[in-house]
């Protein structure tokens, strides 16, 4: 993967973590809501993990966080 892609995955994970915390959810609660393990959720949010996601899973995460999907791509820089 190139640097730009890795950086986008890092920012996506940090954005998911930001909105999860803003909603008052734990990683375990969000993971359960989107049918993945807490470890997988932790890997998604970890700034140095670079775990990729399917569009379907991103849609599930946005729905669970009650935010528009596009919000996940408005990276907090």
Question: Model regions: which residues?
Answer:
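Short C-terminal boundary/hinge segments that cap the last helix of small helical domains
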Residues: 66-77
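Recognition helix of helix-turn-helix/homeodomain-like DNA-binding domains
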Residues: 35-51
